C-alpha cells in the first residue's frame, strides 16, 4: 500500500472516529436559548435591536486580527527556517515575546472581560435529569 493510498483511507476513517467520539462524549444540555437566534452576543428584548453595544466585542475582533497577522508573519520563517539560521530564530522569538507580553498586559487589565447586562435564571430539567441553574 502506497503512502498516498494509506493517507486517502486513513484521514476519512480518523475523521469519522473523532466525530463519533465527540457525539458520544459531548454534553447535551438543550434549552430554549440554544435554539434562539444569536444576535451580536446579546439577546434583543421586545424588538430593541438598536441598543448600546459593548466595545469588548470589537476588542476581541482586533485581537483575532492581530494574532492572525502574527501567524501570517511567522509562516515565511517556518518555510525558510533552515536558511534563516539562528538570527531568524532570535527575531521570531522576540516577535513572539512582544506579542505574548501584549496579550498578558491585556489580560492583566481585564480588557478581555465582557460584562453582560442580562440576568440568566435557567431552572430547566434536561432529558438527562441534570438541572441547569445559573444566576449572575
From Swiss-Prot:
Subcellular location field: Mitochondrion membrane
Topology of this chain in the membrane: Multi-pass membrane protein
Catalytically driven reaction(s): a ubiquinone + NADH + 5 H(+)(in) = a ubiquinol + NAD(+) + 4 H(+)(out)
Signal peptide: none
EC number of this enzyme: 7.1.1.2
Superkingdom: Eukaryota
InterPro entries xref list: NADH_UbQ/plastoQ_OxRdtase_su3 (IPR000440), NDAH_ubi_oxred_su3_sf (IPR038430)
Cellular component, GO annotation: mitochondrial membrane; NADH dehydrogenase complex
Enzyme class: translocase
Keywords, comma-separated and alphabetical: Electron transport, Membrane, Mitochondrion, NAD, Respiratory chain, Translocase, Transmembrane, Transmembrane helix, Transport, Ubiquinone
GO MF terms, alphabetically ordered: NADH dehydrogenase (ubiquinone) activity
Main location: mitochondrion
Residues passing through the membrane, by range: 5-25, 55-75, 85-105
Family, per entry: Belongs to the complex I subunit 3 family.
Role played: Core subunit of the mitochondrial membrane respiratory chain NADH dehydrogenase (Complex I) that is believed to belong to the minimal assembly required for catalysis. Complex I functions in the transfer of electrons from NADH to the respiratory chain. The immediate electron acceptor for the enzyme is believed to be ubiquinone.
Protein's recorded name: NADH-ubiquinone oxidoreductase chain 3
Organism: Emericella nidulans (Aspergillus nidulans)
Amino acid at each position: 500500500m502506497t503512502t498516498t493510498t494509506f493517507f486517502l483511507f486513513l484521514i476519512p476513517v480518523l475523521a469519522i472516529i473523532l466525530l463519533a467520539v465527540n457525539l458520544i462524549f459531548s454534553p447535551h444540555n438543550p434549552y430554549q436559548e440554544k435554539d434562539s437566534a444569536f444576535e451580536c452576543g446579546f439577546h434583543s428584548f421586545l424588538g430593541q435591536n438598536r441598543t448600546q453595544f459593548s466595545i469588548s466585542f470589537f476588542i476581541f475582533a482586533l485581537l483575532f486580527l492581530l494574532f492572525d497577522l502574527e501567524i501570517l508573519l511567522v509562516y515565511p520563517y517556518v518555510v525558510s527556517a533552515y536558511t534563516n539560521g539562528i538570527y531568524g530564530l532570535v527575531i521570531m522569538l522576540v516577535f513572539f515575546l512582544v506579542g505574548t507580553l501584549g496579550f498578558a498586559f491585556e489580560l492583566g487589565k481585564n480588557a478581555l472581560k465582557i460584562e453582560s447586562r442580562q440576568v440568566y435564571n435557567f431552572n430547566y430539567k434536561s432529558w438527562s435529569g441534570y438541572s441547569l441553574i445559573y444566576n449572575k
